[in-house]
């Protein structure tokens, strides 16, 4: 079974491309969805989050305030690393379980979609890595539009991840998503055609 890592950066358009791949009938394991699922499946994670970061990220019912916590770890990269040290082993384990399930039913190719695939060394378990690339000015502009952030806030969030330029060094295939949707679609069609070689 061929394992393809799909990664990108904030506002690079990775989610749109992931959706296009799914629509083509290719199985996609989404690390963001798994990150939400493991919080429910493994109560130990939130116990460790409370012990490490304090109770103020939980409301009066004890529910986790994800948005506030997300904003906090984006502002303080060392805090994000601490959180990833807690949650990543669970995410990796769940991805591995899902990959084995696909392998059991003789799936030929699976895509693992993860924004921090490279930062968390998951690219090493992939047969190839596809990077959704966009220039930094487009990233900043899209973030301001999507998330209503100031230019300074957008730059801080972008800088909290490994740069797309650095990620290029790890990629086998690069999708340039800085143009219009038609150009991106052409590249996706080429990618899907390439995938058929393995299916």
UniProtKB/Swiss-Prot annotation:
Record-level GO BP terms: coenzyme A biosynthetic process
Binding site for ATP: 11-16
SUPFAM superfamilies: P-loop containing nucleoside triphosphate hydrolases
Single GO molecular function: dephospho-CoA kinase activity
One Pfam family cited in the UniProt record for this chain: CoaE
Catalysis: reaction(s): 3'-dephospho-CoA + ATP = ADP + CoA + H(+)
Recorded GO CC terms: cytoplasm
Pathway stated in the Swiss-Prot or TrEMBL entry: Cofactor biosynthesis; coenzyme A biosynthesis; CoA from (R)-pantothenate: step 5/5
Coiled-coil features, chain-numbered ranges: none
Annotated DPCK domain residues: 3-199
CDD domains reported in the protein's UniProt record: DPCK
Keywords: ATP-binding, Coenzyme A biosynthesis, Cytoplasm, Kinase, Nucleotide-binding, Transferase
UniProt-listed PROSITE patterns: DPCK
Keyword Protease: no
Biological role: Catalyzes the phosphorylation of the 3'-hydroxyl group of dephosphocoenzyme A to form coenzyme A.
Protein name: Dephospho-CoA kinase
Annotated source species: Clostridium perfringens (strain 13 / Type A)
């Amino acid at each position: 079974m061929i394992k393809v890592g799909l990664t990108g950066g904030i506002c690079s358009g990775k989610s749109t491309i992931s959706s296009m791949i799914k629509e083509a009938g290719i199985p996609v394991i989404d690390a963001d969805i798994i990150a939400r699922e493991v919080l429910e499946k493994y109560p130990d994670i939130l116990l460790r989050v409370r012990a490490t970061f304090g109770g103020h990220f939980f409301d009066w019912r004890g529910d986790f305030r994800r948005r506030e916590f997300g904003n906090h770890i984006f502002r303080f990269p060392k805090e994000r690393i601490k959180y990833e040290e807690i949650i990543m082993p669970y995410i990796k384990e769940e991805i591995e379980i899902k990959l084995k399930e696909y392998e059991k039913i003789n799936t030929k190719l699976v895509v693992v979609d993860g924004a921090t695939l490279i930062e968390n060394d998951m690219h090493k378990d992939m047969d190839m890595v596809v990077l959704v690339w966009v220039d930094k000015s487009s990233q900043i502009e899209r973030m301001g539009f999507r998330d209503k952030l100031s230019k300074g806030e957008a730059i801080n969030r972008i800088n909290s991840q490994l740069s797309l330029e650095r990620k290029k060094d790890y990629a086998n295939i690069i999708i340039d998503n800085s143009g219009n949707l038609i150009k991106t679609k052409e590249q996706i069609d080429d990618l899907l055609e390439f995938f058929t070689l393995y299916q």
